[in-house]
């Protein structure tokens, strides 16, 4: 056969396109920007009444939050050219709602990195955070862009002597501030220690183990989860063509095994198409696995 083609396939079979990428930075310095108080809807980041402009990324980005907010973010970037802006939902959850992809695209365009100097208006690796974390489905979309989503836990409920929340006159829990993230605060994300630090005092603020799981770090390293998905597909295909075993390159998959429980129809489809079957164990919902794709379905389109 063709020697050059075999060299390429051999490289693909050990996923050199991924393993040769540089690791993510050890420390990421950020400057905070409070996008709003309470839960932040994706409609604030990508308004539904401007949906007609979503195909034009440059135009659609102009409707994120407000012109005033965009000017303030750009001013922060001018004052802190070596730092990334962290968009925050103070006392709430970031990214509730359904316009998640266009929403995170707008955040990335304003605060992320350029994918390429030759591709205009496509950025990646935004950093978003919320006092109560990130909405689960929005967090998945953050991973699509190779971004970072942080549960700040910078406010907590004030408790009485019995450990029960103290309520105000409106019946809502009284909150106590654990640390401040007011606009302009300088923080350091240490990706190796998986900690968040106050840059000014050096004080450790929170643990970030949930933010930097092995799988999420891979998404950040590759520039997004799609790159990992397609990379695994390339590796599997190359190994199949060369008729060699699949070499471990990526982080271990999460496996959920419930020996006494039956399988749903969807679980049966996935199990019958597993590429790397181990000990004939059946995997259940919540597992990560490589599968052969031979069916396409759609949820709502």
Locate predicted features.
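Fe-S-dependent hydro-lyases/dehydratases of central metabolism
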Residues: 1-301
